[in-house]
């Protein structure tokens, strides 16, 4: 039967527990720092590692706009207006006046985009129009009114 003392027990009373000089087995200082320490701009002690494995570690990238400045532009396409015209008439968003159908998009959108076609001459009221949308509305015999 083999009887072997544990290393910890053997080294009781030893200053360094087998690590040589006292300062050799201290904290992060003997290991080049902890984690990403030393990867910064100053002494570049881990510069080659930074360049190879973390090239984006330094430097600024973009910015985030403050929430009070951000504003989502709600859009609607000509295609969706044309397809849902009956529904818009029922809800009262669109109405007929002097033989023309007037669609007031300000209730549900900020800008009208020119995707799709218009089959009827419509008068569309909106806060903004894309250039293509204006062209298509006029080509169909309608009118684009800025509110």
UniProtKB/Swiss-Prot annotation:
UniProt GO MF annotations: rRNA binding; structural constituent of ribosome
Compositional bias (Gly residues): 29-38
Record keyword RNA-binding present: yes
Basic residues composition bias: residue spans: 1-28
GO biological process, one term: translation
Name recorded for this polypeptide: Large ribosomal subunit protein uL15
Family according to the record: Belongs to the universal ribosomal protein uL15 family.
A Pfam family that the UniProt record links to this protein: Ribosomal_L27A
Gene Ontology CC: cytosolic large ribosomal subunit
Gene name for this UniProt entry: rpl15
Organism, scientific name: Pyrococcus abyssi (strain GE5 / Orsay)
Protein's job: Binds to the 23S rRNA.
Subunit comment: Part of the 50S ribosomal subunit.
Region span, Disordered: 1-43
Superkingdom of the organism of origin: Archaea
Assigned keywords, A-Z: Ribonucleoprotein, Ribosomal protein, RNA-binding, rRNA-binding
């Amino acid at each position: 039967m083999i009887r072997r003392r544990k290393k910890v027990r053997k080294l009781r009373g030893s200053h360094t527990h087998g690590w040589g000089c006292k300062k050799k087995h201290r904290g992060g200082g003997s290991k080049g720092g902890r984690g990403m320490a030393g990867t910064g701009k100053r002494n570049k002690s881990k510069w080659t590692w930074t360049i190879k494995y973390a090239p984006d570690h330094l430097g600024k990238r973009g910015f985030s706009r403050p929430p009070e400045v951000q504003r989502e532009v709600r859009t609607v396409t000509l295609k969706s207006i044309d397809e849902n015209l009956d529904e818009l008439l029922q809800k009262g968003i669109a109405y007929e006046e002097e033989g023309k159908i007037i669609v007031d998009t300000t209730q549900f959108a900020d800008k009208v985009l020119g995707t799709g076609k218009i089959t009827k001459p419509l008068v569309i009221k909106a806060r903004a129009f894309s250039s293509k949308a204006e062209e298509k509305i006029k080509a169909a015999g309608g009118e684009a009114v800025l509110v």
